[in-house]
Amino acid sequence: MRFLILLLPFFLFAKEVCLDFSEIDTDDPYVKQAIIRKVEEYVLEAGFKVKCTENTLRIKVRANYREVPSTISARQRVSSYTLYLSVSLGEESFSASVPYSLPSGSLAELPRRKALEEAFSRIKLHIIKYFSREYLREK
């Protein structure tokens, strides 16, 4: 309870930012939702509130997501991929690539989702640093 009381002024006086997710280049609904969720999470960690009003700082979020096959198994099936993720905030761009493999069909989406989480963990600090600079610039 004390922790929440200490955080209350932080959220009351945090600057607001409006994120425009209209340019996310993927048809996969899971990836699109993950990009939105992670960027909003990083905005909150940097000390902003996500709110769109006429006076808020607006940042256009662009994202590009690709999976490129890297090896083919003996049965002529693709078993390894490289996941490329690029997130652009305003004029800055952050990208990561993560290799992953699908050893069997029984694992379904799990290796791919873990690779996406790993890509976000690689660019997390850069995105938070970007928002921290935006916060200082707006003061």
Curated annotation (Swiss-Prot):
Highest taxon of the lineage: Bacteria
Stated name of the protein: Uncharacterized protein aq_252
Species of origin: Aquifex aeolicus (strain VF5)
